[in-house]
Amino acid sequence: MKASKYILPTEKENPADAVVASHRLMIRAGLVRKSSAGLYFYLPLGLKVLKKIEQIVREEMNSTGALEFDLPILTPSDFWEQSGRWSAMGKEMFRIQDRHDLSYALGPTHEESFSFLLKPLLKSYKDLPVNVYQIQTKFRDEIRPRFGVIRSREFIMKDAYSFHIDDSSLDDTYQAMRVAYRKIFDRCGLKTIPVQADSGSMGGSASEEFMVVSPIGEETLLLCNSCGYSSNSEKTPLILKKENSSAKFSEKKEISTPGKKTISEVSTLLGVSESETIKAVALKSEKKKILVFLRGDLELNLHKLHSLLKIADSEPMTDLEIRELGLIPGFISPIAPNDKIKVLYDRSLQKDFPYVVGSSKEDFHTQGFILEKEISGLPEFADVALAREGDLCPNCSFPLKAEKGIEVGHIFKLGDKYTKAFGIQVLDQNGKSKTLTMGCYGIGVNRTMATVIEQCNDEKGIFWPISIAPFEVSLVSIVKGEDQYFKIEEFYNVLMNEGIEVFWDDRDLGPGFKLKDSELIGFPIRITIGKKFFESGEISIYNRKKDQEDSFVFSGFDDLVARVESMRQELFTELR
């Protein structure tokens, strides 16, 4: 490809609204342009990268025996009603009505559609297992799109769904997908960590996210450097260090705390640590009022709570709603007032420790409150607090380390949530009807592209892994007159005929501008031919990742091709 025939709108300045490297560089390198909040146009260079990632995904999926489909983006509301997710998906799902007042969703995911499609196609255990997938545009009405294409409202996703006669078969495919995902991300040049994750509205018994450690990540990962345990903090069980702490207040007594409603305010006033207090969190879901008590220095983990109570979402109660339940905001006692509210106690709490708690009385707290003495029939405590760095590994009790991460892939064991909802049954080996079990496997293609840039950039721009670079080789020519131009064209044609992807910058621009553009865009290999070649036969070849340039005297096209192929193979080998 010749740059003179290409749309190549590179920019020197960073866009004002881009706060992360991938967003800045995708704009500056001419890969994308913004349409509106969370929506992007893909330009030719950016589209080439996307298509290469898609092809890697397709090759690895096909190698496992998965079958590619293409389903409608519009999905009827009936499908979602049948699974119970029309309301559970919340406001993130785009919903539209046609001229006949029929409701549809712009598909954010396709469990329902594939279940509907596969039900009449699967008759017997002999048809199983089957793994089906598509690579398609998805939609989510993100309330705050950010970080360019990392969190956008429209995105390309590979979503796969497997159907099985039993859990053993599901586990085989789950593990095969786990291996395939590592291969996909390795081939894309991404270093990923599989971590245990919460299944959320997807449902199911188990899931793992493929995370890329990055300071801009929106997820918190908890990693064990001793045994290799890794988990999203949303999923990590909380195991606290054992501390020989003695309470400041052992005698039970009501104390005045005027206007002090927060844990920080109360602990400061009384001179106690926040871990000696009990925090009350009042929430409401669609059908429940919820009151959670946990140690004052900890935060509630909503994902654990929702999973435990089998609810889709919750939100804080207002002060008025709290008072209507007979409670005093900021001064709530751990003693449940009535059966109108679901009460949970986090397992961070010690039953025999004298805590500072609310008194159910305006401007008063109680010191020396011991749960097992004050609450009759104390229920089993639940794990609903958020684990943090320094808490203990659930496998080996080594302190956990926290890292921020970007999710690029997610695999789920869905169980029979959708197959039951859609009545997907086959005849087993004994001729009896059996409900199938499912798996689900997703990869964000655009997000993978952006995350590669987050890992592969420097002060000059992007340095693409050669497997997904828009072009493998940049040929920069610095010529005067047609004779020199035609000589360089001979180099271009030879490389192209050897099957090497070449982007020839033949624009009538200064050498500095061309060289900076090639480094900004991030072509893995650059060949520069200019004045020195026409004087002494000297050519330079540049490795963008290493930022290393070597010069040699041209001795023939075979030698040049061999040098390029050697560098290509070196760059591909680094991805393995």
UniProtKB/Swiss-Prot annotation:
Origin superkingdom: Bacteria
Cellular compartments per GO CC: cytosol
UniProt-listed HAMAP family: Pro_tRNA_synth_type1 (MF_01569)
Its biological purpose: Catalyzes the attachment of proline to tRNA(Pro) in a two-step reaction: proline is first activated by ATP to form Pro-AMP and then transferred to the acceptor end of tRNA(Pro). As ProRS can inadvertently accommodate and process non-cognate amino acids such as alanine and cysteine, to avoid such errors it has two additional distinct editing activities against alanine. One activity is designated as 'pretransfer' editing and involves the tRNA(Pro)-independent hydrolysis of activated Ala-AMP.
Record text about domains: Consists of three domains: the N-terminal catalytic domain, the editing domain and the C-terminal anticodon-binding domain.
EC number per UniProt: 6.1.1.15
Catalytic activity: tRNA(Pro) + L-proline + ATP = L-prolyl-tRNA(Pro) + AMP + diphosphate
Assembly mode: Homodimer.
UniProt-recorded name of the protein: Proline--tRNA ligase
InterPro entries, per database record: aa-tRNA-synt_IIb, aa-tRNA-synth_II, aa-tRNA-synth_II/BPL/LPL, Anticodon-bd, Anticodon-bd_dom_sf, Pro-tRNA-ligase_IIa, Pro-tRNA-synth_IIa_bac-type, Pro-tRNA-Synthase_IIa_type1
GO molecular function: aminoacyl-tRNA deacylase activity; ATP binding; proline-tRNA ligase activity
Disulphide linkage map: none
Keywords: Aminoacyl-tRNA synthetase, ATP-binding, Cytoplasm, Ligase, Nucleotide-binding, Protein biosynthesis
CDD domains: ProRS-INS, ProRS_anticodon_short, ProRS_core_prok
Similarity comment: Belongs to the class-II aminoacyl-tRNA synthetase family. ProS type 1 subfamily.
GO biological process: prolyl-tRNA aminoacylation
Subcellular location: Cytoplasm
One Pfam assignment: tRNA-synt_2b
